């Protein structure tokens, strides 16, 4: 039986520290063969959207543009001190950190084939380049208290 994992960051009350704990778990869990990490999206009509538009629980909606409401590569609200840019950087850092572990490669090739693996490797390399050009680097965010 293969273990897959999906989790979400950018929920009310989260900090860089709590997100780091989640990412560390995913990064070091050899039982988890695939880990998906989405950024919370406050879709209209949801409780999360209501909280974000009303500024409750440290949330602040920054865009009503529905074309920007994606779970990957986009964020449309502040979560406490976490800006969309920080959430995106954490998501990219996590992807590189999780999928650059060589012990994940063979299961990925078996599951997605060599082309799927190559596409993942390209994304990791692009994300890694982006991380290295960012002065914060991999998981070096200062937590605001």
Task: Locate predicted features.
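A structural motif corresponding to the C-terminal lobe/cap of the Radical SAM core domain
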Residues: 1-112, 142
